[in-house]
């Protein structure tokens, strides 16, 4: 097995500490700098690839309630589509990295986009929930390479000195755009044809991306024999572990954690598969994943930061979106707000890009946490009368903060992995995928469970005061039942209808209070993260010998 390779983004040779073999083909000379026009085309191609992959996932999440009628399914059953998509997606990039190194970048790119187009075409044959679940599983497998290609096309547009600063920052900004765009374009698509319009649009994007990959080549790294037989078994165990865990986290809150036995089976299967993978990997001299390096102190610190990002960024992607649905707001009523979120994400990404070119890189983290903490706190003051107009400022703050948070961490982690050698990028991918894919599901499941528990708590507190002996309660019941007075003459039935309507209002208010609690928790988590970050920066300033490596580094 060879561990001598080349950075796939810029063609620079990377030599780890203990190389064991030479690549199977000569090293390519560094590419000539691109003209501004050609670089702009590569950047636009990167955006297209990110949108193709991201909209394929987010269009479903944005229309989960509208699709129940199209597929004749309940909310819990529709959630299987998200679980089927994320199960293979969570681990696929790890295998694809080694496949790309062994069989060549060009072949990898062309085959990847063809597979995604075929997966998109399969949507034509979807007729019910079962066929949709199978197609979503295949789409999740086919979509994993597109995010990799999106990164590579963005990095290709910049010289080596700017790849891990400007290139990486813009690429990560592109990953945040598909969620608000999905909410913006969903209403006209659903009006055109429901489920069929959504998958037709997805297929159209895939067909647009197809000629891009064939006409715009990437700098090919040298191929090397990096796949061993044990790598296949280790990856299968990792895929099973991540896949079972993804399904467990996606569906656990909906079916409830302790109510159905198969959730426990999924969790046990995930733990068993990952444990067996660890047992197989630890004794290997050249493992698929260097677990000792992955669990080093520096990487655990980075993983903690990435997990914090997933928790605080879920304020917008999950908690706020569910809050709107709880208030009965549909995508048509939130289009303007998501347009503002989109613009704020772009602004935050561009500001972070500028900061990445200076020595004030850590300022991006500080600004991001301040914006998210303040935005989430403003959202925690919501009521049942709150509408999108009252949340424009807070959601724009959260969007800008989320776009600024990730690039400095990713740049530092990328540079650290490259300093150890290109094979360590696989280990870095494990950390990134676990914290972003599985971490996002953990954040969604934890916050969703928290909202459910707090709703029950607030309901019990509110119901304690619903007594007909209270004249205000009796008056409210009479007012609510008045609309039925012309069709129901029985006084007892009329009061029962009034109590039912009052109970619905109590449940609505309890849900609003529960979401306010969740927003407040996110705000407090962001504030705690900010305090820890400022303490860490102060420590580094006054104790120079403990300072970490520079946040932005480029391979030599």
Show which residues each predicted segment covers.
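Central cavity-lining transmembrane alpha-helices of secondary-active solute carriers
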Residues: 82-98, 147-152, 339-352
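Helix-loop-helix hairpins in multi-pass membrane proteins, especially solute transporters
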Residues: 93-233
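Extracytoplasmic
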Residues: 37-96, 131, 146-147, 317-321
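Hydrophobic transmembrane-helix bundles of small-molecule transporters
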Residues: 187-305, 309-312, 316
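Interfacial helix-cap and linker-helix signal at transmembrane-aqueous boundaries
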Residues: 67-69, 99-100, 132, 185-194, ...
């Amino acid at each position: 097995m060879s561990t001598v390779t080349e950075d796939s983004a810029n063609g620079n040779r990377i030599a780890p500490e203990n190389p064991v073999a030479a690549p199977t083909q000569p090293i390519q000379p560094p590419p000539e700098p691109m003209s501004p026009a050609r670089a702009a085309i590569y950047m636009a191609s990167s955006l297209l690839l990110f949108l193709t992959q991201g909209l394929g996932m987010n269009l479903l999440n944005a229309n989960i309630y509208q699709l129940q009628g199209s597929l004749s399914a309940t909310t819990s059953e529709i959630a299987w589509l998200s679980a089927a998509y994320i199960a293979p997606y969570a681990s696929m990039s790890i295998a694809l990295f080694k496949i790309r190194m062994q069989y060549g970048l060009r072949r990898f790119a062309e085959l990847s986009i063809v597979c995604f187009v075929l997966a998109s075409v399969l949507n034509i044959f979807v007729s019910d929930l079962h066929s949709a679940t199978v197609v979503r599983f295949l789409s999740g497998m086919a979509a994993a390479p597109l995010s990799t290609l999106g990164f590579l096309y963005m990095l290709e547009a910049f010289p080596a000195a700017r790849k891990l600063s400007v290139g990486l920052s813009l690429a990560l900004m592109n990953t945040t755009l598909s969620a608000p765009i999905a909410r913006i374009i969903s209403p006209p698509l659903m009006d055109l044809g429901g489920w069929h319009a959504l998958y037709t649009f997805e297929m159209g994007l895939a067909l647009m991306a197809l000629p891009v990959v064939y006409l715009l080549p990437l700098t090919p790294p040298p191929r090397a024999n990096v796949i061993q037989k044990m790598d296949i078994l280790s990856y299968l165990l990792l895929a099973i572990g991540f896949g079972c865990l993804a399904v467990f986290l996606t569906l656990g809150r909906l079916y409830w954690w302790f109510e159905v036995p198969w959730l426990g089976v999924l969790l046990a299967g995930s733990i068993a598969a990952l444990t067996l993978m660890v047992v197989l990997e630890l004794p290997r001299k050249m493992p698929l994943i260097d677990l000792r390096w992955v669990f080093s102190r520096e990487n655990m610190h980075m993983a903690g930061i990435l997990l914090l990002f997933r928790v605080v960024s879920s304020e917008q992607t999950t908690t706020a979106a569910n809050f709107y649905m709880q208030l009965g707001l549909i995508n048509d009523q939130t289009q303007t707000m998501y347009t503002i979120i989109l613009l704020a994400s772009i602004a935050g990404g561009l500001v972070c890009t500028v900061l990445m070119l200076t020595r004030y890189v850590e300022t991006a983290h500080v600004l991001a946490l301040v914006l998210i903490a303040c935005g989430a706190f403003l959202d925690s003051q919501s009521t049942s009368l709150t509408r999108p107009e009252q949340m424009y400022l807070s959601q724009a703050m959260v969007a800008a903060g989320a776009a600024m948070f990730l690039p400095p961490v990713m740049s530092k982690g990328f540079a650290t992995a490259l300093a150890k050698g290109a094979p360590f990028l696989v280990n870095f991918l494990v950390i990134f995928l676990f914290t972003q894919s599985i971490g996002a599901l953990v954040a969604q499941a934890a916050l969703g469970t928290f909202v459910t528990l707090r709703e029950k708590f607030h309901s019990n507190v509110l119901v304690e005061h619903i007594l007909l002996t209270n004249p205000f309660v009796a008056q409210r019941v009479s007012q609510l039942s008045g609309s039925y007075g012309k069709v129901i003459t029985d006084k007892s039935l009329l009061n029962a209808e009034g109590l039912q309507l009052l109970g619905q209002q109590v449940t609505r208010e309890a849900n609003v209070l529960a979401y306010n609690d969740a927003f407040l928790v996110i705000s407090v988590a962001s504030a705690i993260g900010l305090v820890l970050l400022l303490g860490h920066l102060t420590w580094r300033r006054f104790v120079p010998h403990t300072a970490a490596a520079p946040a932005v580094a480029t391979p030599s």
